[in-house]
């Protein structure tokens, strides 16, 4: 009997690990947030109404790119801008974002990482992330970038306007829309990250399963072998990584650091 119960729990855990993200208006904000947390773009518990700084947005861009697994290789040596020392939490992300041409510094040698990012700045950066060049746009900044972003769906469900500072909620939605949008070459951007994109839906399971370990059944005193960046309990974000006896769980030891737990049955 015990073996049969255990097999059932494992089957349940495997089933919930396959995550398909819908794009209906009723669920897209939660879907975008869960995707951002999973990719490490937004820390668990972040106030979604807070404005996003340029430094934080550089991290979000990198997290939604193929460079998200190479951040540690950047190291902490050297100063790219006079206001971004190598020891800054944003330094490796800013270095990647600038090297890839997604963001730029200012002529005075500063990056101004604590300045808030506006709608037009965010759209311009994401368009570059999708390999769009100025020659692909019509007009001048910022209207050309805003129009192109609207045309390819980056601004779907976004209500902010030109000049407005972007919040975490708005940035996660913008970047989630980028996964569904076509790049300059005409292919869905999410596909380049290993996601399956079909009919406006993004399936992240193919990426998450690569680094997933488990499922496991917790015993008395079981602890995760690391501190996870994000935790999901019964498909909902949780602030606690504590495991109870007979909990069924799986986790990823990649840079994402995601842990998911199914309550004991």
Residue ranges and their predicted role:
Residues 169:
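Surface-exposed binding/hinge segments that line
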Residues 97:
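N-terminal cofactor/phosphate-binding cores enriched in small/glycine residues
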Residues 2-58, 62-91, 100-120, 126-165, ...:
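Feature responds to low-complexity, polar/acidic, surface-exposed segments characteristic
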Residues 247-254, 258-264:
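Repeat-associated, polar segments at repeat-unit boundaries in modular proteins
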Residues 176:
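Conserved redox-cofactor binding core of oxidoreductases
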Residues 235-249:
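Short nucleic-acid-contacting surface segments enriched for D/E, G, S/T with interspersed K/R
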């Amino acid at each position: 009997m015990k073996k049969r119960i255990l097999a059932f729990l494992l089957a349940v855990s495997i089933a919930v690990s396959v995550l398909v993200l819908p794009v209906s208006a009723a669920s897209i904000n939660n879907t975008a947030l869960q995707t951002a947390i999973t990719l490490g773009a937004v820390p668990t518990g972040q106030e979604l109404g807070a404005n996003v700084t340029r430094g934080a947005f550089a991290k979000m861009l990198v997290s939604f790119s193929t460079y998200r697994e190479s951040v540690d290789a950047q190291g902490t040596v050297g100063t790219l801008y006079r206001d971004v020392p190598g020891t800054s939490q944003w330094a490796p992300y800013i270095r990647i974002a600038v090297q890839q041409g997604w963001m730029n510094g200012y002529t005075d040698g500063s990056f101004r990482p604590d300045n808030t990012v506006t709608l037009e700045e965010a759209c311009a950066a994401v368009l570059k992330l999708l390999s769009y060049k100025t020659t692909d746009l019509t007009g001048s900044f910022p209207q050309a970038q805003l129009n192109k972003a609207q045309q390819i769906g980056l601004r779907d469900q976004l209500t902010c306007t030109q000049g407005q500072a972007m919040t975490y909620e708005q940035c996660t939605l913008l970047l989630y829309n980028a996964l569904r949008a076509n790049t300059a070459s005409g292919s869905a951007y999410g596909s380049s990250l290993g996601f399956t994109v079909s009919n406006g839906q993004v399936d992240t399971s193919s990426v998450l399963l690569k680094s997933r370990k488990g499922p496991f059944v917790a015993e008395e005193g079981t602890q995760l072998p690391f501190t996870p960046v994000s935790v999901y309990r019964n498909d909902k974000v949780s602030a606690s990584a504590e495991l109870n006896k007979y909990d069924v769980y799986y986790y990823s030891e990649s840079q994402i650091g995601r842990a998911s737990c199914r309550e004991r049955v």
